[in-house]
Amino acid sequence: MNAPTTVADSVTVPVSLGDRSYDILIGKGLVERAGEEVAKRLKGVRVAIVTDENVAAVHLERLQASFARAGIDSTPVIVAPGEKSKSFATLETVTNAILAAKLERGDAVVALGGGVVGDLSGFVAGIVRRGMNFVQMPTSLLAQVDSSVGGKTGINTAHGKNLVGVFNQPQLVLADTQVLDTLSPREFRAGYAEIAKYGLIDRPDFFAWLEANWQEVFSGGAARTKAIAESCRSKAAVVARDERETGDRALLNLGHTFGHALESATGYDSSRLVHGEGVAIGMALAYRFSARMNLAGIEAAERVEAHLKAVGLPVSLAEVPGGLPPAEKLMDYIAQDKKVTRGTLTFILTHGIGQSFIAKDVPPAAVLEFLKERLAIA
C-alpha cells in the first residue's frame, strides 16, 4: 500500500495504474491552487467545469480565477443539485454544452462537486470525443474519500443506481479540505459513513482510531486530513490491485447492496435518504445479516451500530422517513445490483470488524426473511 507523502500544505496519495497513474492531493487551499496543479500535468488545455447550482454559488468564482491565473480558459456547465441529475437527460445537456463550447479531445472536464457531479462528469469525459481528460475536484466528504477515486462513473436509471456508465480514471484528484467547512452537518455525517467503511473492510486498527478520534475528524484539523488520506490510501491500494472490479474491489461495496436498494426505494429523494445514510444502514444490516448467518458474532454488529449512532448516522430501516415498500420489492432492487452474476446474489459480509469478504450465492430466501424481520421492527 502506497504511503501518503506530505508536501507543504497538502498530502499526496498516489494511485498506481502504470501509465495511467495519478495523484490525489489532499489539503487546504487546493481550489486556489487548481490552475497551477492542472497546468503542471495538462499542457495548453481548456476546461469545462461541471458543477451544481449550490457548489457554483460558493466555489465556482474562485476556481475560475485560479484557472485564469494559470492561463487556462474555463467554461462553466451548471446542473441541478441532487441525485436526480445522474440521468440521461442531464448527461445529454452537459454533453451538448461541452460540444457547443468546442472543447477538443485534449481538453479537460473538471468535476467540481460531490459524488453526483463527479460520476456524471466522469461519464461525460469518457464518452465525449471518445475520451477527454478528466480532473476530479470533490467538494463533499463522501466524494473526497470514495467516489472521486478509482474511475467509476455513471448515471442512474429507472431500473436502479449506477447501471449505465464507464470506468474512466481521472488525471488528477484535488481534495480541498477547506471546502468541507461549507457542508451541512448531515452531508458531513453521510461522508463519514464511507470513512468508517474502510476500517470495517480490512483495517480494524483504523476503525478503532475512528472510534477514539471521530469528534476531531468532525471538528477539522489534522485528524480530518488523516482520516481522508487514510481512506484514499485504502481505496487506492484496492484500485491498483483490481481496477475493474473483477476481484476484491467488490469489498468496497460493503453496505452498498442494501444501501442502493434503499436509495432506489426512496426514489433517490435526498430529503428522505442520501447515499451515505443508505451506506450506514447498509453496513449495519450487513453486520446483522452476517450474525444471523452465523458468520460473525452479534457483538460486532452492535459495535458498528454504536459507532454509527454516536456520529448521528441511521442504522435501521425504521429511520428511513416516509416508510419503505415490502421486502419483496426491496429484493427486486437488490436483484439489480451490479454484483449479481447469472442471477445469483453476491453480498459483502463479514466475520468481524475489519474482516469483510465477498459472499457469493447468498440464498435469496434468507435475505428476504431477514428483510421482513427488519421491516417488522421498523
From Swiss-Prot:
It is an enzyme of class 4 (lyase). It comes from the Bacteria. Its EC number is 4.2.3.4. Its main location: cytoplasm. NAD(+) binds at residues 115-119, 139-140, 152, 161. One of its GO terms (cellular component) is cytoplasm. Its cofactor is Co(2+); Zn(2+); NAD(+). One of its GO terms (molecular function) is 3-dehydroquinate synthase activity. The keyword Isomerase does not apply. Zn(2+) binds at residues 194, 256, 275. The keyword Protein biosynthesis does not apply. Gene3D superfamilies: 3.40.50.1970, Dehydroquinate synthase-like - alpha domain. It is found in: Cytoplasm. It catalyses: 7-phospho-2-dehydro-3-deoxy-D-arabino-heptonate = 3-dehydroquinate + phosphate. SUPFAM superfamilies: Dehydroquinate synthase-like. GO terms for biological process: amino acid biosynthetic process; aromatic amino acid family biosynthetic process; chorismate biosynthetic process. Keywords: Amino-acid biosynthesis, Aromatic amino acid biosynthesis, Cobalt, Cytoplasm, Lyase, Metal-binding, NAD, Nucleotide-binding, Zinc. Pathway: Metabolic intermediate biosynthesis; chorismate biosynthesis; chorismate from D-erythrose 4-phosphate and phosphoenolpyruvate: step 2/7. Binds 1 divalent metal cation per subunit. Can use either Co(2+) or Zn(2+). Catalyzes the conversion of 3-deoxy-D-arabino-heptulosonate 7-phosphate (DAHP) to dehydroquinate (DHQ). Belongs to the sugar phosphate cyclases superfamily. Dehydroquinate synthase family. This is 3-dehydroquinate synthase. It comes from Brucella suis (strain ATCC 23445 / NCTC 10510).
